[in-house]
Protein backbone atom coordinates (compact mmCIF):
# COMPACT_ATOMS: atom_id res chain seq x y z
CA UNK A 1 0.00 0.00 0.00
CA UNK A 2 1.19 3.50 -0.82
CA UNK A 3 2.08 6.00 1.87
CA UNK A 4 2.16 3.35 4.58
CA UNK A 5 3.51 4.37 7.98
CA UNK A 6 3.30 3.06 11.52
CA UNK A 7 2.59 5.60 14.24
CA UNK A 8 2.28 5.47 18.01
CA UNK A 9 -0.93 6.25 19.82
CA UNK A 10 -1.11 9.35 21.99
CA UNK A 11 -0.42 8.18 25.57
CA UNK A 12 -3.98 9.01 26.64
CA UNK A 13 -5.36 6.63 24.01
CA UNK A 14 -3.23 3.77 25.35
CA UNK A 15 -4.49 4.43 28.88
CA UNK A 16 -8.09 4.64 27.71
CA UNK A 17 -7.87 1.41 25.72
CA UNK A 18 -6.42 -0.48 28.67
CA UNK A 19 -8.99 0.82 31.15
CA UNK A 20 -11.89 0.40 28.78
CA UNK A 21 -11.18 -3.19 27.79
CA UNK A 22 -11.05 -4.20 31.46
CA UNK A 23 -13.83 -2.10 32.96
CA UNK A 24 -16.46 -2.20 30.20
CA UNK A 25 -16.22 -5.89 29.38
CA UNK A 26 -19.33 -6.74 31.43
CA UNK A 27 -21.31 -4.42 29.16
CA UNK A 28 -19.38 -5.25 25.99
CA UNK A 29 -22.31 -5.14 23.55
CA UNK A 30 -22.31 -1.33 23.74
CA UNK A 31 -19.52 -1.26 21.15
CA UNK A 32 -22.17 -1.75 18.47
CA UNK A 33 -24.25 1.12 19.82
CA UNK A 34 -21.19 3.38 19.82
CA UNK A 35 -20.14 2.52 16.27
CA UNK A 36 -23.67 2.91 14.88
CA UNK A 37 -23.99 6.20 16.77
CA UNK A 38 -20.78 7.43 15.12
CA UNK A 39 -22.15 6.39 11.72
CA UNK A 40 -25.31 8.38 12.43
CA UNK A 41 -23.21 11.44 13.29
CA UNK A 42 -21.26 11.01 10.03
CA UNK A 43 -24.54 11.00 8.08
CA UNK A 44 -25.73 14.13 9.91
CA UNK A 45 -22.50 15.95 9.04
CA UNK A 46 -22.78 14.98 5.38
CA UNK A 47 -26.36 16.27 5.18
CA UNK A 48 -25.25 19.57 6.70
CA UNK A 49 -22.27 20.04 4.35
CA UNK A 50 -24.38 19.02 1.35
CA UNK A 51 -26.75 21.93 2.02
CA UNK A 52 -24.12 24.20 0.45
CA UNK A 53 -22.51 21.54 -1.78
CA UNK A 54 -24.96 18.88 -3.03
CA UNK A 55 -22.18 17.27 -5.11
CA UNK A 56 -20.90 15.69 -1.88
CA UNK A 57 -23.67 13.11 -2.21
CA UNK A 58 -21.91 11.80 -5.34
CA UNK A 59 -25.26 10.71 -6.74
CA UNK A 60 -26.11 8.65 -3.64
CA UNK A 61 -28.34 10.58 -1.22
CA UNK A 62 -29.80 7.52 0.50
CA UNK A 63 -27.81 7.52 3.73
CA UNK A 64 -27.63 4.35 5.82
CA UNK A 65 -25.42 2.15 7.96
CA UNK A 66 -24.90 -1.51 7.13
CA UNK A 67 -23.86 -4.31 9.47
CA UNK A 68 -22.46 -7.60 8.15
CA UNK A 69 -20.35 -10.47 9.43
CA UNK A 70 -18.15 -13.23 8.08
CA UNK A 71 -18.22 -16.37 10.23
CA UNK A 72 -15.24 -17.93 8.48
CA UNK A 73 -12.98 -14.90 8.95
CA UNK A 74 -14.63 -14.10 12.32
CA UNK A 75 -15.15 -10.46 11.39
CA UNK A 76 -17.98 -8.01 12.00
CA UNK A 77 -18.21 -4.94 9.74
CA UNK A 78 -20.08 -1.66 10.26
CA UNK A 79 -20.15 0.50 7.12
CA UNK A 80 -21.72 3.90 6.46
CA UNK A 81 -21.93 6.23 3.46
CA UNK A 82 -21.62 9.37 5.54
CA UNK A 83 -19.07 12.17 5.43
CA UNK A 84 -15.97 9.94 5.69
CA UNK A 85 -12.43 11.06 6.59
CA UNK A 86 -9.22 12.08 4.87
CA UNK A 87 -5.77 11.00 6.06
CA UNK A 88 -5.24 13.91 8.45
CA UNK A 89 -8.69 13.40 9.98
CA UNK A 90 -8.03 9.69 10.46
CA UNK A 91 -4.80 10.40 12.35
CA UNK A 92 -6.48 13.16 14.35
CA UNK A 93 -9.64 11.22 15.27
CA UNK A 94 -8.30 7.68 15.61
CA UNK A 95 -4.84 8.33 17.03
CA UNK A 96 -5.48 11.09 19.55
CA UNK A 97 -8.05 12.36 22.01
CA UNK A 98 -8.60 16.07 21.56
CA UNK A 99 -10.19 16.77 24.94
CA UNK A 100 -8.14 18.96 27.27
CA UNK A 101 -7.72 17.57 30.75
CA UNK A 102 -7.86 13.99 29.48
CA UNK A 103 -4.49 12.99 30.87
CA UNK A 104 -5.19 14.09 34.45
CA UNK A 105 -8.65 12.53 34.26
CA UNK A 106 -7.30 9.15 33.21
CA UNK A 107 -4.54 9.27 35.82
CA UNK A 108 -7.16 9.83 38.53
CA UNK A 109 -9.03 6.66 37.62
CA UNK A 110 -8.94 4.00 40.30
CA UNK A 111 -9.37 0.25 40.28
CA UNK A 112 -13.09 0.18 41.08
CA UNK A 113 -14.44 -1.36 37.88
CA UNK A 114 -18.05 -0.26 38.39
CA UNK A 115 -16.92 3.31 38.98
CA UNK A 116 -14.46 3.19 36.09
CA UNK A 117 -17.18 1.91 33.79
CA UNK A 118 -19.39 4.92 34.55
CA UNK A 119 -16.53 7.38 34.18
CA UNK A 120 -15.25 5.97 30.91
CA UNK A 121 -18.80 5.76 29.65
CA UNK A 122 -19.48 9.44 30.24
CA UNK A 123 -16.09 10.21 28.69
CA UNK A 124 -17.48 8.94 25.39
CA UNK A 125 -15.43 5.99 24.17
CA UNK A 126 -16.93 5.92 20.68
CA UNK A 127 -14.66 4.21 18.17
CA UNK A 128 -12.28 2.73 20.75
CA UNK A 129 -15.07 0.56 22.19
CA UNK A 130 -14.42 -1.78 19.25
CA UNK A 131 -11.35 -3.10 21.08
CA UNK A 132 -13.53 -4.51 23.88
CA UNK A 133 -14.42 -7.43 21.60
CA UNK A 134 -11.79 -7.19 18.83
CA UNK A 135 -8.07 -7.89 18.94
CA UNK A 136 -7.61 -6.04 15.64
CA UNK A 137 -9.63 -3.27 14.00
CA UNK A 138 -9.38 -2.28 10.34
CA UNK A 139 -10.80 0.97 8.96
CA UNK A 140 -11.27 1.88 5.30
CA UNK A 141 -12.59 5.38 4.66
CA UNK A 142 -12.85 8.15 2.08
CA UNK A 143 -14.04 11.70 2.60
CA UNK A 144 -17.11 12.82 0.65
CA UNK A 145 -16.02 14.79 -2.43
CA UNK A 146 -12.51 13.30 -2.53
CA UNK A 147 -11.18 11.21 -5.42
CA UNK A 148 -11.35 7.39 -5.06
CA UNK A 149 -7.53 7.20 -4.85
CA UNK A 150 -7.63 9.42 -1.73
CA UNK A 151 -9.03 6.64 0.42
CA UNK A 152 -7.35 5.86 3.74
CA UNK A 153 -6.53 2.54 5.42
CA UNK A 154 -6.07 2.37 9.21
CA UNK A 155 -5.37 -0.73 11.30
CA UNK A 156 -4.38 -1.47 14.89
CA UNK A 157 -4.32 -4.23 17.48
CA UNK A 158 -4.87 -1.60 20.17
CA UNK A 159 -1.47 -2.15 21.73
CA UNK A 160 0.26 1.18 21.29
CA UNK A 161 0.68 1.48 17.52
CA UNK A 162 -1.43 1.79 14.40
CA UNK A 163 -0.75 1.62 10.67
CA UNK A 164 -2.09 4.16 8.20
CA UNK A 165 -1.84 4.01 4.40
CA UNK A 166 -3.36 5.31 1.16
CA UNK A 167 -5.86 3.12 -0.70
CA UNK A 168 -8.40 3.40 -3.49
CA UNK A 169 -11.99 3.39 -2.23
CA UNK A 170 -14.73 3.96 -4.78
CA UNK A 171 -17.56 4.76 -2.40
CA UNK A 172 -17.42 7.50 0.22
CA UNK A 173 -17.88 6.88 3.95
CA UNK A 174 -16.31 4.66 6.57
CA UNK A 175 -16.09 0.89 6.89
CA UNK A 176 -14.95 -0.54 10.24
CA UNK A 177 -14.07 -4.23 10.42
CA UNK A 178 -13.65 -5.90 13.82
CA UNK A 179 -11.50 -9.04 13.96
CA UNK A 180 -13.17 -10.65 16.96
CA UNK A 181 -11.28 -12.01 19.94
CA UNK A 182 -11.55 -15.68 20.85
CA UNK A 183 -14.78 -16.29 22.73
CA UNK A 184 -16.72 -13.42 21.09
CA UNK A 185 -18.59 -15.55 18.55
CA UNK A 186 -21.96 -14.30 19.84
CA UNK A 187 -21.41 -11.24 17.63
CA UNK A 188 -21.37 -13.48 14.58
CA UNK A 189 -24.91 -14.62 15.36
CA UNK A 190 -27.60 -13.00 13.22
CA UNK A 191 -30.28 -12.98 15.93
CA UNK A 192 -27.90 -11.59 18.57
CA UNK A 193 -26.73 -8.73 16.36
CA UNK A 194 -30.32 -7.91 15.36
CA UNK A 195 -31.42 -7.77 19.00
CA UNK A 196 -28.57 -5.40 19.94
CA UNK A 197 -29.40 -3.07 17.03
CA UNK A 198 -33.09 -3.06 17.99
CA UNK A 199 -32.22 -2.39 21.63
CA UNK A 200 -29.84 0.50 21.09
CA UNK A 201 -30.58 2.03 17.69
CA UNK A 202 -34.34 2.14 17.19
CA UNK A 203 -34.38 5.89 17.84
CA UNK A 204 -31.76 6.77 15.20
CA UNK A 205 -33.14 8.47 12.08
CA UNK A 206 -30.57 6.69 9.92
CA UNK A 207 -31.68 3.27 8.59
CA UNK A 208 -29.59 0.47 10.09
CA UNK A 209 -29.50 -2.52 7.76
CA UNK A 210 -28.21 -6.04 8.29
CA UNK A 211 -26.89 -8.28 5.56
CA UNK A 212 -29.13 -11.14 4.40
CA UNK A 213 -27.67 -14.04 2.41
CA UNK A 214 -29.98 -16.38 0.53
CA UNK A 215 -29.20 -19.26 -1.80
CA UNK A 216 -31.01 -18.99 -5.14
CA UNK A 217 -30.30 -21.27 -8.08
CA UNK A 218 -27.01 -22.31 -6.53
CA UNK A 219 -25.86 -18.74 -6.02
CA UNK A 220 -25.62 -16.60 -2.89
CA UNK A 221 -27.84 -13.53 -3.19
CA UNK A 222 -27.06 -10.65 -0.85
CA UNK A 223 -29.75 -8.18 0.25
CA UNK A 224 -30.12 -5.69 3.10
CA UNK A 225 -32.89 -5.66 5.70
CA UNK A 226 -33.71 -2.56 7.75
CA UNK A 227 -33.71 -3.39 11.48
CA UNK A 228 -34.62 -0.11 13.19
CA UNK A 229 -37.60 2.24 12.89
CA UNK A 230 -35.32 4.88 11.32
CA UNK A 231 -37.50 7.77 12.46
CA UNK A 232 -36.03 10.57 14.55
CA UNK A 233 -37.33 9.96 18.05
CA UNK A 234 -38.20 13.60 18.75
CA UNK A 235 -40.51 13.72 15.71
CA UNK A 236 -42.68 10.95 17.09
CA UNK A 237 -45.70 11.39 19.34
CA UNK A 238 -44.79 11.34 23.04
CA UNK A 239 -47.51 8.82 23.82
CA UNK A 240 -45.89 6.31 21.45
CA UNK A 241 -42.40 6.50 22.97
CA UNK A 242 -41.36 4.18 25.79
CA UNK A 243 -39.10 5.24 28.64
CA UNK A 244 -36.46 2.79 27.44
CA UNK A 245 -36.40 4.54 24.07
CA UNK A 246 -35.96 7.94 25.71
CA UNK A 247 -33.13 6.51 27.83
CA UNK A 248 -31.34 4.99 24.85
CA UNK A 249 -31.69 8.16 22.81
CA UNK A 250 -30.11 10.09 25.68
CA UNK A 251 -27.16 7.70 25.72
CA UNK A 252 -26.81 8.18 21.96
CA UNK A 253 -26.66 11.98 22.00
CA UNK A 254 -24.81 12.36 25.32
CA UNK A 255 -22.41 9.43 24.85
CA UNK A 256 -23.30 8.44 28.41
CA UNK A 257 -23.72 4.96 29.85
CA UNK A 258 -26.16 5.84 32.62
CA UNK A 259 -29.86 6.64 32.34
CA UNK A 260 -30.84 10.31 32.70
CA UNK A 261 -32.65 11.51 35.82
CA UNK A 262 -35.53 13.01 33.88
CA UNK A 263 -36.44 14.56 30.53
CA UNK A 264 -38.92 16.87 28.85
CA UNK A 265 -40.18 16.37 25.29
CA UNK A 266 -42.24 19.22 23.83
CA UNK A 267 -43.55 20.38 20.49
CA UNK A 268 -44.43 24.09 20.30
CA UNK A 269 -46.54 25.64 17.55
CA UNK A 270 -47.70 29.20 17.04
CA UNK A 271 -45.51 32.30 17.01
CA UNK A 272 -42.49 30.01 17.09
CA UNK A 273 -42.40 26.43 15.90
CA UNK A 274 -39.90 24.03 17.40
CA UNK A 275 -39.50 20.67 19.10
CA UNK A 276 -37.24 20.24 22.10
CA UNK A 277 -36.06 17.13 23.91
CA UNK A 278 -34.13 18.07 27.05
CA UNK A 279 -32.44 15.72 29.50
CA UNK A 280 -31.02 16.10 33.01
CA UNK A 281 -28.08 13.66 33.37
CA UNK A 282 -27.72 11.57 36.52
CA UNK A 283 -23.97 12.17 36.68
CA UNK A 284 -21.82 15.24 36.06
CA UNK A 285 -19.34 14.94 33.19
CA UNK A 286 -15.76 14.67 34.38
CA UNK A 287 -14.79 17.94 32.68
CA UNK A 288 -17.79 20.01 33.81
CA UNK A 289 -15.51 22.62 35.41
CA UNK A 290 -12.98 22.66 32.58
CA UNK A 291 -12.93 26.00 30.76
CA UNK A 292 -12.79 24.13 27.44
CA UNK A 293 -15.75 21.89 28.33
CA UNK A 294 -18.15 21.83 25.41
CA UNK A 295 -21.79 22.12 26.29
CA UNK A 296 -25.05 23.03 24.63
CA UNK A 297 -27.78 21.35 22.64
CA UNK A 298 -27.72 19.59 19.30
CA UNK A 299 -29.33 21.95 16.81
CA UNK A 300 -31.53 20.76 13.96
CA UNK A 301 -33.37 23.01 11.53
CA UNK A 302 -36.36 21.38 9.86
CA UNK A 303 -35.00 17.91 10.80
CA UNK A 304 -31.56 18.69 9.31
CA UNK A 305 -28.61 18.46 11.69
CA UNK A 306 -26.77 21.80 11.92
CA UNK A 307 -24.33 21.59 14.84
CA UNK A 308 -23.38 19.98 18.13
CA UNK A 309 -22.88 21.98 21.31
CA UNK A 310 -25.04 24.98 20.38
CA UNK A 311 -24.47 26.76 23.70
CA UNK A 312 -26.60 29.78 22.71
CA UNK A 313 -29.82 28.02 23.73
CA UNK A 314 -28.95 27.51 27.41
CA UNK A 315 -27.57 29.87 30.07
CA UNK A 316 -24.21 28.87 31.48
CA UNK A 317 -25.67 27.78 34.83
CA UNK A 318 -27.68 25.10 32.95
CA UNK A 319 -24.69 23.86 30.94
CA UNK A 320 -25.25 20.33 32.24
CA UNK A 321 -28.50 19.98 30.23
CA UNK A 322 -28.22 17.64 27.24
CA UNK A 323 -30.61 17.20 24.36
CA UNK A 324 -31.66 18.87 21.16
CA UNK A 325 -33.80 21.53 19.59
CA UNK A 326 -35.35 21.24 16.13
CA UNK A 327 -36.45 24.69 14.91
CA UNK A 328 -38.59 25.67 11.93
CA UNK A 329 -37.75 29.37 12.33
CA UNK A 330 -33.98 29.40 11.78
CA UNK A 331 -32.36 29.34 8.32
CA UNK A 332 -30.63 26.16 7.18
CA UNK A 333 -27.39 28.08 6.66
CA UNK A 334 -27.37 29.33 10.25
CA UNK A 335 -23.94 29.83 11.84
CA UNK A 336 -22.82 30.31 15.44
CA UNK A 337 -22.38 34.02 14.69
CA UNK A 338 -25.95 34.33 13.38
CA UNK A 339 -27.25 32.42 16.42
CA UNK A 340 -25.50 34.87 18.75
CA UNK A 341 -27.43 37.89 17.42
CA UNK A 342 -30.73 36.24 16.53
CA UNK A 343 -34.05 37.28 18.09
CA UNK A 344 -35.29 33.75 17.40
CA UNK A 345 -32.37 32.37 19.42
CA UNK A 346 -33.04 34.70 22.35
CA UNK A 347 -36.71 33.73 22.42
CA UNK A 348 -35.86 30.03 22.22
CA UNK A 349 -33.27 30.39 24.99
CA UNK A 350 -35.82 32.08 27.24
CA UNK A 351 -38.45 29.40 26.59
CA UNK A 352 -36.02 26.48 27.00
CA UNK A 353 -34.58 27.93 30.22
CA UNK A 354 -38.06 28.13 31.73
CA UNK A 355 -38.73 24.59 30.53
CA UNK A 356 -35.65 23.23 32.33
CA UNK A 357 -36.44 25.11 35.55
CA UNK A 358 -40.00 23.73 35.47
CA UNK A 359 -38.64 20.25 34.85
CA UNK A 360 -36.36 20.55 37.90
CA UNK A 361 -39.16 21.95 40.04
CA UNK A 362 -41.35 18.99 39.09
CA UNK A 363 -38.52 16.55 39.86
CA UNK A 364 -38.01 18.15 43.29
CA UNK A 365 -41.72 17.94 44.04
CA UNK A 366 -42.32 14.40 42.73
CA UNK A 367 -39.10 12.62 43.71
CA UNK A 368 -37.02 14.19 46.48
CA UNK A 369 -34.47 11.36 46.35
CA UNK A 370 -33.81 11.85 42.65
CA UNK A 371 -33.61 15.59 43.16
CA UNK A 372 -30.96 15.06 45.84
CA UNK A 373 -28.98 13.06 43.28
CA UNK A 374 -29.27 16.00 40.91
CA UNK A 375 -28.28 18.48 43.62
CA UNK A 376 -25.16 16.54 44.62
CA UNK A 377 -24.03 16.43 40.98
CA UNK A 378 -25.05 19.88 39.74
CA UNK A 379 -25.98 22.04 42.74
CA UNK A 380 -22.78 24.08 42.55
CA UNK A 381 -23.49 24.90 38.90
CA UNK A 382 -27.09 25.90 39.61
CA UNK A 383 -25.81 28.29 42.30
CA UNK A 384 -24.38 30.41 39.49
CA UNK A 385 -27.96 31.13 38.42
CA UNK A 386 -29.03 33.98 40.73
CA UNK A 387 -26.12 36.12 39.47
CA UNK A 388 -26.51 35.17 35.81
CA UNK A 389 -30.27 35.16 35.34
CA UNK A 390 -32.12 37.85 37.27
CA UNK A 391 -35.34 37.26 35.32
CA UNK A 392 -35.62 33.69 36.64
CA UNK A 393 -34.09 34.33 40.06
CA UNK A 394 -37.19 33.36 42.06
CA UNK A 395 -37.58 30.09 40.13
CA UNK A 396 -33.88 29.28 40.65
CA UNK A 397 -34.11 30.15 44.35
CA UNK A 398 -36.88 27.56 44.79
CA UNK A 399 -34.49 24.91 43.47
CA UNK A 400 -31.60 25.73 45.81
CA UNK A 401 -30.85 23.41 48.72
CA UNK A 402 -28.96 24.17 51.93
CA UNK A 403 -27.71 22.63 55.13
CA UNK A 404 -29.29 24.28 58.17
CA UNK A 405 -29.43 24.21 61.95
CA UNK A 406 -32.84 22.53 61.66
CA UNK A 407 -31.47 19.24 60.35
CA UNK A 408 -28.15 19.00 62.24
CA UNK A 409 -26.62 17.44 59.12
CA UNK A 410 -24.17 18.63 56.48
CA UNK A 411 -26.49 17.28 53.75
CA UNK A 412 -27.93 20.12 51.67
CA UNK A 413 -31.60 19.18 51.76
CA UNK A 414 -33.41 22.30 53.03
CA UNK A 415 -35.27 24.44 50.49
CA UNK A 416 -36.07 28.11 51.02
CA UNK A 417 -39.76 27.20 51.03
CA UNK A 418 -39.02 24.77 53.89
CA UNK A 419 -37.22 27.53 55.79
CA UNK A 420 -39.97 30.13 55.33
CA UNK A 421 -42.61 27.64 56.48
CA UNK A 422 -40.72 27.25 59.78
CA UNK A 423 -40.06 30.94 60.47
CA UNK A 424 -40.97 32.08 63.98
CA UNK A 425 -43.79 34.51 64.62
CA UNK A 426 -42.48 38.01 64.11
CA UNK A 427 -39.35 36.81 62.27
CA UNK A 428 -38.85 39.05 59.26
CA UNK A 429 -35.59 37.81 57.75
CA UNK A 430 -33.99 34.62 56.46
CA UNK A 431 -30.79 34.14 58.45
CA UNK A 432 -27.69 32.51 57.02
CA UNK A 433 -23.97 32.22 57.62
CA UNK A 434 -21.12 31.54 55.19
CA UNK A 435 -17.98 29.74 56.29
CA UNK A 436 -15.10 27.61 55.00
CA UNK A 437 -16.72 24.37 56.18
CA UNK A 438 -19.97 23.00 57.53
CA UNK A 439 -18.39 22.55 60.97
CA UNK A 440 -17.14 26.14 61.04
CA UNK A 441 -20.59 27.42 60.10
CA UNK A 442 -22.45 25.17 62.54
CA UNK A 443 -20.22 26.06 65.50
CA UNK A 444 -19.88 29.78 64.79
CA UNK A 445 -20.52 31.99 67.84
CA UNK A 446 -22.69 34.18 65.58
CA UNK A 447 -25.39 31.52 65.93
CA UNK A 448 -25.59 31.42 69.74
CA UNK A 449 -28.59 33.68 70.31
CA UNK A 450 -30.49 32.37 67.28
CA UNK A 451 -29.93 28.80 68.43
CA UNK A 452 -31.16 29.71 71.94
CA UNK A 453 -34.31 31.23 70.42
CA UNK A 454 -34.91 28.22 68.16
CA UNK A 455 -34.48 30.28 65.01
CA UNK A 456 -33.20 28.37 61.99
CA UNK A 457 -30.01 29.46 60.24
CA UNK A 458 -28.89 28.32 56.79
CA UNK A 459 -25.31 27.00 56.88
CA UNK A 460 -23.45 27.84 53.66
CA UNK A 461 -19.98 26.40 53.16
CA UNK A 462 -19.45 26.13 49.38
CA UNK A 463 -16.96 28.61 47.93
CA UNK A 464 -19.57 30.03 45.57
CA UNK A 465 -22.09 30.75 48.36
CA UNK A 466 -20.84 34.18 49.42
CA UNK A 467 -20.78 35.36 45.82
CA UNK A 468 -24.27 33.94 45.21
CA UNK A 469 -25.72 35.68 48.27
CA UNK A 470 -24.57 39.05 46.91
CA UNK A 471 -27.20 38.59 44.20
CA UNK A 472 -29.84 36.60 46.08
CA UNK A 473 -31.24 39.36 48.26
CA UNK A 474 -34.74 38.11 49.06
CA UNK A 475 -37.14 35.21 48.73
CA UNK A 476 -40.92 35.27 49.09
CA UNK A 477 -40.69 38.89 50.25
CA UNK A 478 -38.23 38.01 53.04
CA UNK A 479 -34.78 39.61 53.01
CA UNK A 480 -31.67 37.50 53.55
CA UNK A 481 -29.52 38.47 56.52
CA UNK A 482 -25.98 37.29 57.21
CA UNK A 483 -25.59 36.63 60.93
CA UNK A 484 -21.93 37.65 60.58
CA UNK A 485 -22.98 41.24 59.92
CA UNK A 486 -24.13 43.72 62.54
CA UNK A 487 -27.93 43.83 62.44
CA UNK A 488 -30.59 45.29 64.69
CA UNK A 489 -33.03 42.46 64.01
CA UNK A 490 -30.65 40.01 65.71
CA UNK A 491 -30.12 42.27 68.72
CA UNK A 492 -33.90 42.64 69.07
CA UNK A 493 -34.17 38.89 69.52
CA UNK A 494 -32.40 39.19 72.89
CA UNK A 495 -34.60 39.14 75.98
CA UNK A 496 -35.65 42.49 77.35
CA UNK A 497 -32.77 43.74 79.40
CA UNK A 498 -33.92 44.42 82.96
CA UNK A 499 -33.16 47.66 84.78
CA UNK A 500 -30.37 46.11 86.85
CA UNK A 501 -28.65 44.88 83.68
CA UNK A 502 -28.98 48.31 82.10
CA UNK A 503 -27.34 49.86 85.15
CA UNK A 504 -24.57 47.25 84.97
CA UNK A 505 -23.97 48.12 81.33
CA UNK A 506 -23.71 51.80 82.19
CA UNK A 507 -20.95 50.85 84.57
CA UNK A 508 -19.16 49.15 81.64
CA UNK A 509 -19.27 52.24 79.40
CA UNK A 510 -15.82 53.44 80.58
CA UNK A 511 -14.50 49.93 79.88
CA UNK A 512 -15.80 50.12 76.30
CA UNK A 513 -14.14 53.50 75.82
CA UNK A 514 -10.94 52.12 77.29
CA UNK A 515 -10.97 49.25 74.72
CA UNK A 516 -11.66 51.73 71.89
CA UNK A 517 -8.70 53.84 72.93
CA UNK A 518 -6.45 50.79 73.10
CA UNK A 519 -7.41 49.35 69.70
CA UNK A 520 -7.72 52.67 67.87
CA UNK A 521 -8.35 52.37 64.12
CA UNK A 522 -7.67 48.62 64.12
CA UNK A 523 -11.44 48.16 64.54
CA UNK A 524 -14.38 50.15 63.24
CA UNK A 525 -16.16 50.22 66.59
CA UNK A 526 -16.39 48.55 69.98
CA UNK A 527 -19.78 47.80 71.51
CA UNK A 528 -21.58 45.53 73.96
CA UNK A 529 -23.85 42.85 72.55
CA UNK A 530 -26.64 40.58 73.79
CA UNK A 531 -26.39 38.13 70.87
CA UNK A 532 -23.83 35.91 72.65
CA UNK A 533 -24.51 33.26 75.29
CA UNK A 534 -21.27 31.26 75.65
CA UNK A 535 -18.65 33.32 73.83
CA UNK A 536 -16.90 36.40 75.29
CA UNK A 537 -16.53 38.33 72.02
CA UNK A 538 -17.08 38.29 68.26
CA UNK A 539 -16.27 40.50 65.32
CA UNK A 540 -18.94 41.54 62.80
CA UNK A 541 -19.00 43.73 59.71
CA UNK A 542 -21.36 46.51 58.72
CA UNK A 543 -23.96 45.73 56.07
CA UNK A 544 -22.02 47.74 53.45
CA UNK A 545 -18.61 46.27 54.38
CA UNK A 546 -16.97 43.43 52.45
CA UNK A 547 -17.56 40.16 54.31
CA UNK A 548 -14.78 37.87 55.50
CA UNK A 549 -15.72 35.13 53.02
CA UNK A 550 -15.81 37.55 50.09
CA UNK A 551 -12.37 38.87 51.07
CA UNK A 552 -11.10 35.27 51.04
CA UNK A 553 -12.52 34.73 47.56
CA UNK A 554 -10.78 37.85 46.26
CA UNK A 555 -7.50 36.80 47.86
CA UNK A 556 -7.74 33.27 46.42
CA UNK A 557 -8.24 34.80 42.97
CA UNK A 558 -5.05 36.83 43.40
CA UNK A 559 -6.88 40.15 43.59
CA UNK A 560 -6.07 42.97 45.99
CA UNK A 561 -8.37 42.94 48.99
CA UNK A 562 -9.31 46.09 50.91
CA UNK A 563 -8.73 45.79 54.64
CA UNK A 564 -11.89 44.64 56.42
CA UNK A 565 -12.70 46.88 59.39
CA UNK A 566 -14.51 44.82 62.00
CA UNK A 567 -16.87 45.82 64.77
CA UNK A 568 -15.63 44.29 68.03
CA UNK A 569 -18.64 43.11 70.07
CA UNK A 570 -18.24 42.10 73.72
CA UNK A 571 -20.55 39.95 75.84
CA UNK A 572 -21.12 41.90 79.11
CA UNK A 573 -22.29 38.74 80.92
CA UNK A 574 -19.18 36.68 80.21
CA UNK A 575 -16.70 36.14 83.04
CA UNK A 576 -13.66 36.92 80.85
CA UNK A 577 -15.13 40.27 79.80
CA UNK A 578 -16.01 41.11 83.42
CA UNK A 579 -12.55 40.15 84.62
CA UNK A 580 -10.92 42.23 81.87
CA UNK A 581 -13.12 45.21 82.75
CA UNK A 582 -12.15 44.95 86.42
CA UNK A 583 -8.37 44.79 85.94
CA UNK A 584 -6.42 47.89 86.90
CA UNK A 585 -3.09 46.62 85.56
CA UNK A 586 -2.71 48.35 82.16
CA UNK A 587 -0.25 45.78 80.80
CA UNK A 588 -2.56 42.92 81.77
CA UNK A 589 -5.58 44.82 80.41
CA UNK A 590 -3.84 45.21 77.05
CA UNK A 591 -2.90 41.51 76.92
CA UNK A 592 -6.44 40.34 77.72
CA UNK A 593 -8.14 42.71 75.26
CA UNK A 594 -5.71 41.61 72.54
CA UNK A 595 -6.44 37.98 73.42
CA UNK A 596 -10.21 38.51 73.22
CA UNK A 597 -9.81 40.23 69.85
CA UNK A 598 -7.52 37.48 68.54
CA UNK A 599 -10.04 34.83 69.62
CA UNK A 600 -12.83 36.66 67.82
CA UNK A 601 -10.73 37.16 64.67
CA UNK A 602 -9.59 33.53 64.67
CA UNK A 603 -13.20 32.31 64.97
CA UNK A 604 -14.22 34.59 62.11
CA UNK A 605 -11.31 34.16 59.68
CA UNK A 606 -9.70 30.85 60.66
CA UNK A 607 -6.27 32.52 60.56
CA UNK A 608 -4.31 35.19 62.45
CA UNK A 609 -1.64 37.57 61.21
CA UNK A 610 0.55 36.70 64.21
CA UNK A 611 -0.43 33.30 65.67
CA UNK A 612 2.71 33.19 67.83
CA UNK A 613 1.61 36.23 69.82
CA UNK A 614 -1.80 34.63 70.31
CA UNK A 615 -0.18 31.42 71.63
CA UNK A 616 2.05 33.45 73.96
CA UNK A 617 -0.94 35.31 75.41
CA UNK A 618 -2.91 32.08 75.81
CA UNK A 619 -0.01 30.44 77.66
CA UNK A 620 0.37 33.47 79.88
CA UNK A 621 -3.33 33.41 80.76
CA UNK A 622 -3.21 29.69 81.56
CA UNK A 623 -0.38 30.06 84.07
CA UNK A 624 -1.67 33.27 85.67
Curated annotation (Swiss-Prot):
Record-given protein name: Chaperone protein HtpG
Domain of life, source organism: Bacteria
Classification via InterPro entries: HATPase_C_sf, Heat_shock_protein_90_CS, HSP90_C, Hsp90_fam, Hsp90_N, Ribosomal_Su5_D2-typ_SF
MF-aspect GO terms: ATP binding; ATP hydrolysis activity; ATP-dependent protein folding chaperone; unfolded protein binding
Keywords, alphabetical: ATP-binding, Chaperone, Cytoplasm, Nucleotide-binding, Stress response
Protein family: Belongs to the heat shock protein 90 family.
Chain segments carrying region C: 553-624
Stretch list, region B: 337-552
Sequence segments annotated as region (A): 1-336
Oligomer and partners: Homodimer.
Keyword Heme: no
Known function: Molecular chaperone. Has ATPase activity.
Cellular-component GO terms for this entry: cytoplasm
CDD domains: HATPase_Hsp90-like
Coiled-coil intervals, chain numbering: none
Pfam families noted in UniProt: HATPase_c_3, HSP90
Location within or outside the cell: Cytoplasm
Species, as recorded: Salmonella choleraesuis (strain SC-B67)
Keyword NADP attributed: no
Gene: htpG
